[in-house]
C-alpha cells in the first residue's frame, strides 16, 4: 500500500530494490538508442502465445461450454505502454498481437467475452499504481462492474478503434516530467 500515490511516492520508497531497478531500466531505455521492431521476436512470441492460449485457456472453454468466461487484459499504467511504444516497439507489437489473437480466437465461442481497459482514463492516473503493472485493488471491483455492464468488451471489428485510442493517449502522455523526477532522484542518491 505504501507505494500507491504516484511517482513522488515511488521516489520516497526508491530504496525498494524493485523500484530502484525499475527506475534504472526506465532511464537506460530513454537514454539508449531508439529500438526497431524485431519481426522475428514478434512472430515467435505470437506463435507461442497462440499455442499457450489454446493449450491453457481454450482447452477449458471447450470442456465447459455451459460456463461463461470473462477474460480481460490487465490495465497497465500508461507509462508502460509509452515505454514499450517508444523504446521497445517489439514489445508494443507483441502486446497488440496478443490482444488481437485472443480476441479473434475468443470470437469463435458464444460463452467467452474479452475485455480491455487500456483506453480508459484511469490508466493515466499514476496514483492508483504502485508500479507500472500493479494497480490498486479497488480497480478490481470497477473492472468486475464494467464487465457486468459490458463496458470495455473487445470484438475484432473494434480493435482498430481501440488501438487508435490507446495510441492517441500514448502520444499525449507527458513522459518527460516523470523522467526528470526519476533522474533527479537517481542523481541525488548517486544510484
Specify the residue positions occupied by each region the protein language model found.
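Secreted/periplasmic serine-hydrolase-like ester/acetyl group-modifying domain
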Residues: 1-66, 160-191
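Alpha-helix N-cap and loop-to-helix initiation/capping positions
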Residues: 45-48, 87-94, 135
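Alpha-helix boundary/N-cap detector
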Residues: 14-17, 93, 138
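Extended hydrophobic/aromatic segments used for targeting, binding, or gating
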Residues: 61, 66-73, 77-126
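Conserved catalytic-core segments centered on acid/base and nucleophilic motifs
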Residues: 53-61, 67-70, 133-135, 139-140, ...
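C-terminal regions of proteins
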Residues: 99-191
Amino acid at each position: 500500500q505504501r507505494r500507491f500515490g504516484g511517482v513522488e511516492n515511488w521516489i520516497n520508497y526508491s530504496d525498494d530494490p524493485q523500484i530502484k531497478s525499475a527506475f534504472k531500466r526506465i532511464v537506460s531505455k530513454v537514454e539508449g538508442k531508439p529500438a526497431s521492431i524485431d519481426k522475428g521476436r514478434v512472430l515467435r512470441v505470437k506463435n507461442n502465445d497462440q499455442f499457450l492460449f489454446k493449450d491453457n485457456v481454450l482447452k477449458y472453454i471447450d470442456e465447459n461450454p455451459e460456463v461463461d468466461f470473462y477474460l480481460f487484459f490487465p490495465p497497465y499504467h500508461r507509462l508502460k505502454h509509452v515505454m514499450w511504444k517508444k523504446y521497445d516497439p517489439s514489445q508494443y507489437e507483441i502486446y497488440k498481437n496478443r490482444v488481437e489473437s485472443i480476441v479473434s480466437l475468443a470470437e469463435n465461442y458464444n460463452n467467452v467475452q474479452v475485455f480491455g481497459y487500456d483506453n480508459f482514463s484511469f490508466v493515466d492516473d499514476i496514483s492508483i499504481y504502485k508500479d507500472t503493472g500493479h494497480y490498486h485493488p479497488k480497480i478490481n471491483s470497477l473492472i468486475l462492474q464494467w464487465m457486468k455492464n459490458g463496458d470495455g468488451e473487445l470484438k475484432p471489428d473494434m480493435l482498430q478503434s481501440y488501438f487508435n485510442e490507446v495510441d492517441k493517449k500514448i502520444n499525449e502522455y507527458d513522459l518527460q516530467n516523470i523522467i526528470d523526477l526519476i533522474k533527479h532522484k537517481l542523481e541525488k542518491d548517486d544510484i
